[in-house]
């Protein structure tokens, strides 16, 4: 019977087939609040009502364009209202993966890391920083000129060519729990975490 209620009357909250209240959600499943306010008024009252519709781009990209902030509500005459407020500006997306620059050259140290201040790093980004062989925080010492001057083998450079220098501390504290990073390092091949137990 709930489907027959308020057919021609005032717009009230939506209900499901059992009469339970249902919240409006946007296309991504985020709840929408803002009855009575449209456009700029809804945005000022509720913050960014409906959320910014910034579609996902690849990591490390910078998206310049229109950021649509939408507000939903009812108009004073009973007609459903929908207002948009375009905001122009820069929206930084991505979490700073290394770009692969810094290879080659004549023995220069290049520190490849994009720092986006204000961005939060995810767990995977923190893990990738700690693992050797990833490009998250790499100090390249690709010394093309150092090999022939007696610092190492021909073309070898100082240290390992193209590898990052990571100080790894392998502590075995018996009786203490291992951290998440230690457990992950043990699972990955080539990280030196396998102790042979």
From Swiss-Prot:
Biased composition range(s): Polar residues: 1-14
Region: Disordered, residue numbers: 1-86, 133-197
Region (2 X approximate repeats): 16-31, 126-190
Sequence repeats: 16-21, 26-31, 126-133, 183-190
Bias (Basic and acidic residues) ranges: 165-188
InterPro entries recorded: Dehydrin, Dehydrin_CS
Tissues where the protein occurs: Shoots, roots, and cotyledon from dehydrating seedlings.
GO cellular component terms given for this protein: cytosol
Record keyword Repeat present: yes
Entry's induction text: By abscisic acid (ABA) and water stress.
GO biological process, one term: cold acclimation
Top-level division of the source organism's lineage: Eukaryota
Signal peptide: none
Keyword set, alphabetical order: Repeat, Stress response
Bias-annotated ranges (Gly residues): 74-83, 144-160
Family membership: Belongs to the plant dehydrin family.
Protein name: Dehydrin DHN1
Organism for this UniProt entry: Pisum sativum
Lineage, highest ranks first: Eukaryota, Viridiplantae, Streptophyta, Embryophyta, Tracheophyta
């Amino acid at each position: 019977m709930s489907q027959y209620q308020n057919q021609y009357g005032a717009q009230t909250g939506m209900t499901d087939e059992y009469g339970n209240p249902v919240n409006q959600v946007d296309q991504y499943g985020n709840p929408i609040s803002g009855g009575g306010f449209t456009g700029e008024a809804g945005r000022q009252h509720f913050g960014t009502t409906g959320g910014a519709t910034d579609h996902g781009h690849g990591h490390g990209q910078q998206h310049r364009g229109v950021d649509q902030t939408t507000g939903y509500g009812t108009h004073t005459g009973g007609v459903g209202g929908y207002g948009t407020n375009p905001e122009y500006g820069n929206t930084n997306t991505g979490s700073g993966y290394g770009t692969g620059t810094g290879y080659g050259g004549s023995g220069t140290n290049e520190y490849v890391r994009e720092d986006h201040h204000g961005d939060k790093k995810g767990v995977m980004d923190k893990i990738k920083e700690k693992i050797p062989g990833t490009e998250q925080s790499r100090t390249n010492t690709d010394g093309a000129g150092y090999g022939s001057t007696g610092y190492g083998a021909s073309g070898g450079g100082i240290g390992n060519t193209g590898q990052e220098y990571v100080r790894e501390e392998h502590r075995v504290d018996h009786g203490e729990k291992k951290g998440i990073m230690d457990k992950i390092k043990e699972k990955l091949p080539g990280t030196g975490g396998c102790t042979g137990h």
